Amino acid sequence: MKKRFFALLLSLSLLLSGCTIYIELPWEDDTQPQTVSGDGLVVHFLDVGQADCALLECDGQAMLIDGGNVDDSQLLVSYLEQQYIDTLTAVICTHAHEDHVGGLPAVLAKYQAETVYAPVTEYSSKVFSDFVKYTGRQGLSVTIPSPGDTFRLGQAQVTFLGPVKQYEDTNNTSLVVKVVYGQTSFLFTGDMEKEAEHDLLDTEPDISADVLKVGHHGSDTSSSYRFLYEVNPTYGVISVGAGNSYGHPHEEVVSRLKDAGIVQLRTDQLGTIKATSDGSEITFWWENQNAAPEDVTPAGERYYVGNKNSKTFHAPTCGSLPAKKNQVLFTDYTEAINQGYTPCRGCLG
């Protein structure tokens, strides 16, 4: 588990007037911090309503992760123009749903990309077909990455972690992308749901990250307790539309994020959110200067609670915890499994 401390000047209340948050991230005592000499990593979480879109810039290179809805096409192209983007090192479509691929055909019609990634090359929708068509017009083919594939965006390392299996549910086919810059890291999961989260965790990758783009717009189909425990982020960015018909983010997810001590930054409240990393510190800025993320209580040591009698183990916030005398604590999910305990279907299912 990553070490954490909140040299974040945390209390947020001291910082909210400027709408900027600073965090410094520690490293293990027996290692030296990885240094970077570039211009920094900037991650723009665009406010595209009930959709996803992130622009990443590092050392003069840029890439997109998802492109919002079709109706966001002009917004996205205009935003790239405002950032003086000329070409894209990579365009990543996490999965084929319209609220992730929608604006990418317009981007590919205007901007040359070096590589275009997606989990599939065919899908039964016009917008995805347009995405493939405009990729082809650049003389490129859509690349389906494998877990472990990496590339560089300036001095940032981009690694594909999933999906680790084949799925019928399109959400679970989402590409899982980790971006590391110096001692800081960001994790993008598209709309990956709990089934794929657990399959990914079973492969024991390093999914720890300082900033998590919360999966599936904060739907309760994603962001399981176990997944949040293993990622152990300080911040969770939720890309979501105000008053959306899905009720995102679901209260269950908001509660789990709070229980985990994760600061929630929501595009429906803050507008476009920008995170800047110099390799050791992350600074946040957001568009709506009259709003601020809710303060949180930093989480203590994280653990699982086992029931000695039923041999079931739970999240510490579960409503079905055994009496104290029947409890056994585990610091790791795998430890509980190895000792013959079964995860609670209610809180860890």
Regions found by a protein language model. Give the residues of each.
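SH3-family beta-barrel domains
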Residues: 297-311
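Non-globular, low-confidence helical/coil segments that flank catalytic cores
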Residues: 2-5, 16-300, 320, 326, ...
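Immediate flanking context of iron-sulfur cluster ligation sites
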Residues: 307, 336-338
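Short aromatic-glycine-(Arg/Gly/Cys) micro-motifs in beta-strand/loop hairpins
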Residues: 307-323
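Short, solvent-exposed mixed-charge patches
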Residues: 348-349
